């Protein structure tokens, strides 16, 4: 199923769409309106299909967009949001990385790819790949992972990373 909802935060509109079945299968969001959201949704659907995730894209209202928004605003924790994820189609490595990130990097904090890699005994490149493939942005806070040289690398847009961190109270 697909459920989308629009919210206002810090004077901006954020549209959050969630693909769900037994739990959240994927999340996309846009600060730039519906057209950009459609592109992000298409990219997510393609990624989930490649991972063998069975999708129904029938639009139906659900609690999930509001749940994601509540994670963003701090009304509920990332850990609580994580419990709603299906984790379907993820590798064991991705599950390990996402679980660690949710438990260890809190609102208002950032960590480098290298430090995450050291904690998980892997490479910064592997961590970067897992962050890029994250189908659950906001709930799995990939925006809190920054590059040592360029902290603003982020999919879909660097300004989105800055906005999410600002909402969470992070200051450089």
From Swiss-Prot:
PANTHER family: METHYLATED-DNA--PROTEIN-CYSTEINE METHYLTRANSFERASE. Belongs to the MGMT family. Its main location: cytoplasm. The keyword Transcription regulation does not apply. This enzyme catalyzes only one turnover and therefore is not strictly catalytic. According to one definition, an enzyme is a biocatalyst that acts repeatedly and over many reaction cycles. NCBIfam families: DNA_protcyst_Mta_Thcoc (NF041132), ogt (TIGR00589), PRK03887.1 (NF003022). InterPro entries: DNA_protcyst_Mta_Thcoc, MethylDNA_cys_MeTrfase_AS, MethylDNA_cys_MeTrfase_DNA-bd, MethylDNA_cys_MeTrfase_DNAb, MGMT_N, MGMT_N_sf, WH-like_DNA-bd_sf. Disulfide bonds: none annotated. SUPFAM superfamilies: Methylated DNA-protein cysteine methyltransferase domain, Methylated DNA-protein cysteine methyltransferase, C-terminal domain. Its EC number is 2.1.1.63. Keywords: Cytoplasm, DNA damage, DNA repair, Methyltransferase, Transferase. This is Methylated-DNA--protein-cysteine methyltransferase. It catalyses: a 6-O-methyl-2'-deoxyguanosine in DNA + L-cysteinyl-[protein] = S-methyl-L-cysteinyl-[protein] + a 2'-deoxyguanosine in DNA; a 4-O-methyl-thymidine in DNA + L-cysteinyl-[protein] = a thymidine in DNA + S-methyl-L-cysteinyl-[protein]. It comes from the Archaea. One of its GO terms (biological process) is methylation. GO terms for cellular component: cytoplasm. It holds the Pfam family DNA_binding_1. The active site is at residue 142. GO terms for molecular function: methylated-DNA-[protein]-cysteine S-methyltransferase activity. Involved in the cellular defense against the biological effects of O6-methylguanine (O6-MeG) and O4-methylthymine (O4-MeT) in DNA. Repairs the methylated nucleobase in DNA by stoichiometrically transferring the methyl group to a cysteine residue in the enzyme. This is a suicide reaction: the enzyme is irreversibly inactivated. It is found in: Cytoplasm.
